[in-house]
Design a protein with these regions (language model features):
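Charge-dense, intrinsically disordered terminal/linker segments
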Residues: 1-24, 78, 115, 187-191
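Short coil/turn segments at beta-strand junctions that form active-site/ligand-binding loops
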Residues: 22-24, 96-97, 147-150
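Short catalytic/ligand-binding loop motif for oxyanion handling, primarily in non-cytosolic enzymes
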Residues: 35-37, 42-43, 98, 107-111, ...
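Substrate-recognition element of Asp-dependent hydrolases with the DxDx(T/V) motif
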Residues: 73-78, 82-117
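Hydrophobic/aromatic residues located in beta-strands of well-ordered beta-sheets
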Residues: 97-98, 127, 172
């Protein structure tokens, strides 16, 4: 997987002579884009994904089981292509992209998610805490700056829809894997 991503990056770099101008502000989701939250959850839930666990055990059962594991967020593993994806994002936007994440339930989660980003992705990255995924548009930087397009990379359909419906100059990309997301980003910034 890493070899495929690295060869894709080399191909894109050959097609791109310079970085994207400051006409884009990029935002990257954390869970499911950079961190393997599903894999970590399966370890504590008997192999079930969060949606399956909640279907079986009730709507708030996700938070109940996660809260029984005080270091859940900090102990999660990066997705295999997270670093390559992040390096591509960071290298192709003049304004350093923030990671925008959902706070979930409580300060401990915010602290652990922020520490995870600092440890695994970039110690200097700006972390924006949204109170929920669908509220991420409320945290857009320079939202009134003309000719500035705000791009969100997220793995959740409802967050994508909320971002795109939040105003002019909003593009949301549905993350499936690093290679596909890099291609999507490249298709936008190369225009």
């Amino acid at each position: 997987m890493h070899i495929l991503l690295r060869s894709l990056l080399k191909e894109i770099e050959q097609d791109q002579s310079e970085q994207s101008p400051l006409k884009y502000q990029f935002y990257c989701d954390m869970d499911g884009v950079l961190v393997d939250m599903d894999g970590g959850f399966k370890k504590i839930s008997g192999g079930l994904l969060p949606k399956d666990y909640e279907a079986k055990n009730g709507k708030n059962s996700f938070w109940k089981i996660v809260n029984q594991h005080p270091n859940f967020w900090i102990e999660l593993e990066p997705l295999p292509d997270a670093k390559v994806l992040w390096d591509y994002i960071k290298d192709n936007f003049k304004t350093p992209p923030p990671v925008i994440l959902s706070a979930g339930q409580g300060n401990r989660i915010v602290e652990q998610k922020t520490a995870w980003i600092r440890k695994h992705i970039d110690p200097s990255v700006q972390v924006i805490i949204a109170n929920s995924g669908v509220n991420k548009p409320q945290y857009i930087i320079n939202s009134t700056e003309p000719n500035l397009t705000h791009i969100l990379l997220d793995d959740t359909n409802k967050n994508i829809t909320a971002w795109e419906n939040s105003g002019e100059g909003r593009i949301a990309l549905l993350h499936k894997n690093g290679a596909d997301s890099i291609k999507l980003i490249q298709s936008i910034i190369s225009k």
